[in-house]
A protein has these predicted regions:
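Conserved glycine-rich cofactor-binding loop
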Residues: 12, 19-21
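Residue(s) in the substrate-gating loop at a strand-loop-helix junction
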Residues: 147
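C-terminal helical subdomain
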Residues: 181-184, 188-189, 208-250, 254
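Active-site-adjacent segment of SDR/Rossmann-fold oxidoreductases
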Residues: 152, 174-184
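Substrate-binding pocket helix/loop in short-chain dehydrogenase/reductase
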Residues: 102-104, 108-113
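The beta1-alpha1 cofactor-binding region of Rossmann-like NAD(H)/NADP(H)-dependent oxidoreductases
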Residues: 65-77, 109
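Active-site helix of classical SDR
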Residues: 127, 164
Length: 259
């Protein structure tokens, strides 16, 4: 941890999508920084497995199952963890999804709605849950895992995914506008390609060689950790992190050729 960073001892962190990928790696980072970490997701077995593995490393991990698309489910999970540990100091929204059929010619209304509900509405549900406690505590850190697809348009992530991630930018800006006066700072965190399970939803699965070029979840977790452990007067409002070999720069032409 750099000289600029502050520890998370005694704080409660909540990671949605915490069972796998970026969420899991971030939960581990936060736990090593001293936080008690609650992880949420829909797949309870996956959450319990992750929690057991991280507890074996000496980390304080709570399992709080929740479907981020369901506001009542999110509120119930938040009530459980805050009832045990007090207000959430750090929220990382890492739950996300995509669908294989991504172009207008193949995408269904149901597929579009599913992606929007999880990637956008799910973030709003989690933020709604934690804001009152953060205001009362005099501050907090929220990191919303978006995507490079929400920072610059390319067609290969698909219209539903790109729309859901692009909408997170004004969501974050509005939060910093309204909640910064209460000590709450929010980051629109935009990673490029990361080797996570969401790759399985691609119409053209990446090769092992392509996956080897991507960011690792731990790379992203390190950057998220830097964001949420910055001094309280510092707001990193947007972070873009990408692999050196960046498919967004080549326009996904390799995917189009193979599709």
């Amino acid at each position: 941890m750099g000289a600029m960073q502050q520890g998370l001892d005694g704080k409660l962190a909540w990671v949605t999508g915490g069972g796998t990928g970026i969420g899991r790696a971030t939960a581990a980072w936060l736990g090593r920084a001293g936080a008690t970490v609650a992880i949420s997701g829909r797949r309870v077995e996956e959450l319990e497995k992750t929690a057991a593995e991280l507890r074996a490393q000496g980390l304080r991990i709570e399992v709080a199952p929740a479907d981020v698309a369901d506001a009542a489910s999110v509120a119930a999970a938040h009530a459980t963890i805050s009832g045990r540990h007090g207000p959430v100091s750090v929220l990382v929204c890492a739950a996300g999804t995509n669908v294989p059929n991504r172009s207008w010619s193949k995408l269904t209304p149901e597929g579009f709605a599913k992606v929007i509900q999880i990637n956008l509405v799910g973030v709003a549900n989690a933020v709604h849950a934690v804001l009152p406690g953060m205001r009362a505590a005099g501050g907090g850190s929220i990191c919303i895992v978006s995507s490079l697809a929400g920072w610059t348009y390319k067609d290969f992530p698909g219209v539903a995914y790109s729309s859901s991630k692009t909408a997170l930018d004004p969501l974050v800006q509005s939060l910093n506008d309204e909640e910064g006066r209460h000590g709450v700072r929010v980051c629109h965190f935009c990673p490029g390609e990361v080797a996570t399970p969401i790759l399985r939803t691609r119409p053209v699965p990446p090769s092992d060689e392509e996956i080897a070029r991507m960011l690792r979840p731990e790379d992203v977790a390190d950057a998220i950790g830097y964001v949420v452990s910055a001094p309280s007067h510092v707001c990193l409002a947007e972070v873009v992190i990408a692999p050196t070999w960046n498919r967004f720069y080549i326009g996904g032409e390799d995917l189009k050729r193979r599709a």
